[in-house]
């Protein structure tokens, strides 16, 4: 689960991190009032969306008057912001953050952390190349990113934070300030179950002070039950509507850009199904794992989710009956087809527990459902059916 910038800054400030002050505004009038309250020579108005690249997309503007702040807020609020990290539809802007005057600054640094599955540790990253896309730095000049692995038994050690400060070229009181900031970041990361944390840029101001100009936090969704106060900050408007609906039924759904809907039990089988659809010349419209213990109700909801995507021109159902029985899946498919009034081709491949009985139930249903023998056969049939419709 992602947090907005204003939420991330509020959380980080509780751990002693110096953050750029800002006031949330949900209307042009509130933006103008925020500008007056900040009282600087200018302010920065930032669109609050769950996506990077806001500046280049016109979502971050410098304003020099209350009228200008109101005008920028008016042009942003209620629109969708399209960045390199969003799809073509973009993300809805429901509010803006009016931030204090921070510039000019001496330098812009980068501070981030992720859970690294390779080392099975939290890994912090620092770089002198702040204020730019860190992905580009990692690709073009990876040597400019310094990584610090944190031993989970002892946590972040002060010497590690000092080493990072020296690597960034900091000196004197700046080293102590950065060390405090980095140790606070680690504490926030662990106590709140972050999956990803980023401050870009981390500004070194002309007075020698450090300030978090931006803040990005992604929370581990599997740990949200431990943080109801953070879960309450979830902004579903920033998420794919179908993915939100899927989470309510414990379905793993990811929307893609193809036209062949996929319903599979098991993540590995789901990925293999998408691969073979591509191999046969088709384009999967989604990743959807109904889980090993799929129930009739979840299969019906999965069908509804797939067909809610207007780009879907056919559906491939690929079920391996291990825990789940194929005859139960067959009954659920029939119920879903009748309830949703399916008009697109549906190809079903059933293997495993009661597969023959499941196939018999489908064949005797009187519905336009195509049975397949094996994954290759299933992929070929759905790709051919979709091309015939197109």
Swiss-Prot record:
Keyword Nucleotidyltransferase in record: no
Record-linked InterPro entries: ATP-grasp, ATP-grasp_succ-CoA_synth-type, ATP_grasp_subdomain_1, Succ-CoA_synthase_bsu_CS, SUCC_ACL_C, Succ_CoA_ligase-like_bsu, Succinyl-CoA_synth-like
Binding site for Mg(2+): 200, 214
Positions bound to substrate: 265, 322-324
GO molecular function: ATP binding; magnesium ion binding; succinate-CoA ligase (ADP-forming) activity; succinate-CoA ligase (GDP-forming) activity
EC number: 6.2.1.5
UniProt entry keywords in alphabetical sequence: ATP-binding, Ligase, Magnesium, Metal-binding, Nucleotide-binding, Tricarboxylic acid cycle
Amino-acid positions noted as binding ATP in the UniProt annotation, renumbered to this chain: 46, 53-55, 100, 103, 108
Entries under Pfam families matching the protein: ATP-grasp_2, Ligase_CoA
Transmembrane segments: none
Cofactor remark from the record: Binds 1 Mg(2+) ion per subunit.
Residues annotated as domain ATP-grasp: 9-245
Cellular component GO terms held in the UniProt record: cytosol; succinate-CoA ligase complex
Reactions the enzyme catalyzes: succinate + ATP + CoA = succinyl-CoA + ADP + phosphate; GTP + succinate + CoA = succinyl-CoA + GDP + phosphate
Pathway the protein takes part in: Carbohydrate metabolism; tricarboxylic acid cycle; succinate from succinyl-CoA (ligase route): step 1/1
Record GO biological process: succinyl-CoA metabolic process; tricarboxylic acid cycle
Keyword Ligase: yes
Cofactor(s) the protein needs: Mg(2+)
Record-linked NCBIfam families: PRK00696.1, sucCoAbeta
Record function comment: Succinyl-CoA synthetase functions in the citric acid cycle (TCA), coupling the hydrolysis of succinyl-CoA to the synthesis of either ATP or GTP and thus represents the only step of substrate-level phosphorylation in the TCA. The beta subunit provides nucleotide specificity of the enzyme and binds the substrate succinate, while the binding sites for coenzyme A and phosphate are found in the alpha subunit.
Subunit structure: Heterotetramer of two alpha and two beta subunits.
Similarity annotation: Belongs to the succinate/malate CoA ligase beta subunit family.
Stored HAMAP family: Succ_CoA_beta (MF_00558)
Name of the molecule in the record: Succinate--CoA ligase [ADP-forming] subunit beta
Originating gene: sucC
């Amino acid at each position: 689960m992602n947090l907005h910038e204003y939420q991330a800054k509020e959380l980080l400030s509780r751990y002693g991190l110096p953050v750029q002050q800002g006031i949330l505004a949900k209307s042009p009038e509130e933006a103008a009032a925020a500008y007056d309250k900040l009282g600087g020579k200018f302010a920065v108005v930032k669109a609050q969306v769950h996506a990077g690249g806001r500046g280049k997309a016109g979502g971050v503007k410098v304003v020099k008057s209350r009228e200008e702040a109101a005008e920028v807020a008016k042009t942003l609020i209620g629109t969708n912001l399209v960045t390199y990290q969003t799809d073509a539809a973009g993300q809805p802007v429901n509010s803006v953050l009016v931030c204090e005057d921070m510039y000019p600054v001496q330098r812009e640094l980068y501070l981030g952390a992720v859970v690294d599955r390779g080392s099975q540790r939290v890994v912090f990253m620092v770089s002198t190349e702040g204020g730019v896309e860190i992905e580009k730095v990692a690709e073009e000049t990876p040597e400019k990113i310094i990584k610090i692995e944190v031993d989970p038994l002892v946590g972040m050690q002060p010497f590690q934070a000092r080493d990072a400060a020296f690597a960034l070229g900091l000196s004197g009181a700046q080293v102590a300030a950065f060390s405090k900031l980095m140790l606070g970041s680690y504490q926030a990361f662990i106590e709140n179950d972050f999956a990803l944390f980023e401050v870009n840029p981390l500004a070194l101001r002309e007075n020698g002070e450090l300030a978090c100009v931006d803040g990005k936090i992604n929370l581990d969704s599997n740990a949200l039950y431990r943080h109801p106060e953070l879960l309450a900050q979830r902004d579903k408007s920033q998420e794919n509507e179908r993915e939100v609906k899927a989470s309510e039924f414990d379905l793993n759904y990811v929307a893609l850009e193809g036209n062949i809907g996929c319903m599979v039990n098991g993540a590995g089988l789901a990925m293999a199904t998408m691969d073979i659809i591509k191999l046969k010349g088709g384009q999967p419209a989604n990743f959807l794992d109904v889980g090993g213990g799929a129930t009739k109700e979840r299969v019906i909801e999965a069908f509804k989710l797939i067909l809610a995507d207007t780009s879907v021109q056919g559906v491939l159902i690929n079920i391996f009956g291990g825990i789940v029985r194929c005859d139960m899946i067959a009954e659920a498919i029939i119920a879903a087809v009748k309830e949703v009034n399916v008009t697109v081709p549906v190809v079903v491949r059933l293997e495993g527990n009661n597969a023959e009985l499941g196939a018999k139930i489908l064949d005797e249903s009187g519905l336009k459902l195509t049975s397949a023998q094996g994954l290759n056969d299933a992929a070929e049939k759905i790709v051919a059916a979709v091309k015939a419709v197109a």
